[in-house]
Design a protein with these regions (language model features):
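Membrane-interface alpha-helices at helix entry/exit sites of multi-pass transporters
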Residues: 58-62, 99-116, 288-300, 328-331, ...
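Transmembrane alpha-helix interface/packing and boundary motifs in multi-pass membrane proteins
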Residues: 27-41, 70-83, 158-163, 259-268, ...
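Re-entrant/interfacial helical elements at transmembrane boundaries that shape
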Residues: 41-50, 64, 79-99, 130, ...
């Protein structure tokens, strides 16, 4: 009952004209950047951080969430019509969606993707609304040792999830944690790693790092490669709508995809790629027409797209209740909260209920807006693919520079922006994930503060981390998550050597 009352109050916030406008802008931008390969919601939110710092926090965060949801929708368009997923989570959709488009059924493929995303987003957002308060009640009971252990789990799982190598993920994470040490030590008041530069006394701005790594780094990386003409877009033939048979074959995959996407997205090592491919393989086994798989089975589009969007809502569960990002976009959204002096977690639900529940309520509205916008404007989304990449990324560089200077007109800040941008370019070139570095900068100082608090309570005894059951369990999970990839890699090499 309390959840329904809170949600009703949230809708009263979300239906304010300014909030509706922010939501509309968010879903429109999100769909547009989801369509464009290589852009994505994480880069877009990072670009908008500097220009939204003076806006209303609730409106800005609603817009960021709309961009996140819209990016999930938009990625399916290029996956189906171009066989080039705008988002990695749309890879599974491309397997059958592009085949449907080539067979003249691009319209039904786009329709089942859009409606499946709507159904999954709606169900998953309901799950978020009812699961979040329960997790908040649990998190209130956490001591500093439990929070420290939880952040260790986040560090390990984020490092293992992003990129192909856990070791490279950990390297990126440690770089971010090292940057988090810069500034004034809150316990002793001493300057750390500032090298006599006054601008570093307040630490490294998360916004500068995020924009540098995601926007400037991506632009430099694209510029370093030889630009290619976009691939030929598969034209949409026939009806844009689904027939009775398509509806009959799609509804069960939508529900199964949602069941995969939401819980896996809510896990610290979840993400959207795992549930989408899990949904694809499940639909391939359960399909009554297995001969169609690989040639354009509608179940292979319906299930993965539902899983994709459900995982987006699932990602917001640990972000809002525990302050733990489980995707690149969630990490940038966490930076968005922090630029307004807000820390997601149990206290945020108690201190800013209108903001939190307004954000959750806006997700329902965003889903409705997206299903209305996607199909009628399909021609507009396709035309975006004709924008030359040099123009697009040159615009990103200019926008990133102007936005950063607007927040902090300092030569040092500008130097850091392009320094982080060049670092982001090098990390992409040598296949190091950039998201763990942002997570390290955000969560590193928080983990340090919780560890210090725990040691102060225990009079310096580190065994307090193992004496409490919750923290001991979490540290055990972190250890297994850290060791497992290396053990599996060793076993695979051993088996390969035997063969």
């Amino acid at each position: 009952m309390d959840t329904l009352l809170s949600l009703a109050n949230g809708f009263s916030v979300a239906f304010e004209p300014s909030k509706l406008l922010f939501c509309l802008i968010g879903v429109f931008l999100g769909t547009a950047v989801g369509v464009l390969p290589g852009i994505g919601p994480a880069l877009t939110v990072a670009l908008l951080l500097p220009v939204t710092f003076k806006l209303d926090p609730a409106g800005s965060l609603i817009m960021f969430a709309g961009i996140y949801y819209g990016g999930m929708y938009g990625g399916s368009t290029t996956a189906i019509l171009l066989n080039a997923p705008g988002e990695s989570a749309s890879l599974a959709t491309a397997l059958e969606g592009s085949k449907m488009a080539k067979a003249g059924r691009g319209g039904p493929a786009l329709a089942t993707a859009a409606i499946g995303s709507f159904v999954a987003g709606l169900i998953a957002t309901i799950g978020l609304a009812f699961l979040a308060p329960w997790l908040v009640e649990l998190a209130v009971k956490f001591g500093p040792w439990d929070y420290f252990a939880l952040m260790i789990v986040a560090f390990v799982t984020v490092s293992a999830t992003f990129g192909d190598s856990p070791l490279r993920g950990l390297t990126s994470l440690f770089l971010g944690m090292l940057l988090g040490l810069i500034g004034i030590d809150k316990l002793t008041g001493q300057a750390r790693l500032t090298f006599g530069v006054p601008e570093l006394l307040n630490g490294v701005e998360v916004t500068t790092l995020a924009v540098g790594l995601f926007a400037v780094g991506e632009a430099l990386y694209v510029a370093s490669k030889r630009w290619r003409e976009p691939e030929e877009i598969i034209p949409i033939k026939g009806s844009l709508w689904m027939n009775k048979q398509d509806w009959k074959r799609s509804w069960a995959p939508w529900l199964r995809g949602t069941a995969f996407g939401f819980p896996i997205g809510a896990l610290p090592a979840g993400g959207a790629e795992v549930p989408t491919f899990l949904s694809y393989s499940t639909e391939k086994k359960l399909c009554k027409y297995p001969e169609e798989f690989g040639k354009g089975a509608i179940e292979g589009v319906a299930g993965p797209e539902a899983a994709n969007n459900a995982s987006a809502a699932g990602t917001l569960v640990p972000l809002l209740t525990l302050g733990l990002p489980t995707s690149a976009t969630a990490a940038i959204m966490l930076a968005g909260f922090q630029q307004y002096g807000l820390n997601p977690g149990p206290l945020l639900f108690a201190e800013k209920p209108d903001l939190v529940w307004g954000l959750i309520a806006s997700l329902f509205i965003a889903n409705v807006m997206l299903v209305i916008l996607n199909l009628p404007l399909i021609g507009l989304w396709v035309r975006l693919l004709a924008i030359p990449q040099p123009w697009l990324y040159a615009g990103i560089l200019v926008f990133a520079t102007m936005g950063t200077l607007a927040v902090n007109p300092s030569p040092v800040e500008l130097g850091m922006l392009f320094g982080f941008g060049y670092l982001g370019y090098l990390m992409r070139r040598y296949d190091y994930p950039v998201a763990p570095m942002v997570v390290g900068l955000i969560l590193g100082p928080m983990a340090e503060a919780q560890l210090r608090r725990a040691l102060q309570i225990s009079l310096g005894d580190p065994m307090i981390l193992l004496e409490n059951p919750i923290s001991a369990t979490l540290l055990g999970i972190a250890f297994i998550a850290l060791v497992a990839p290396f053990v599996m890699s060793g076993l695979n090499k051993f088996k390969a050597a035997e063969d």
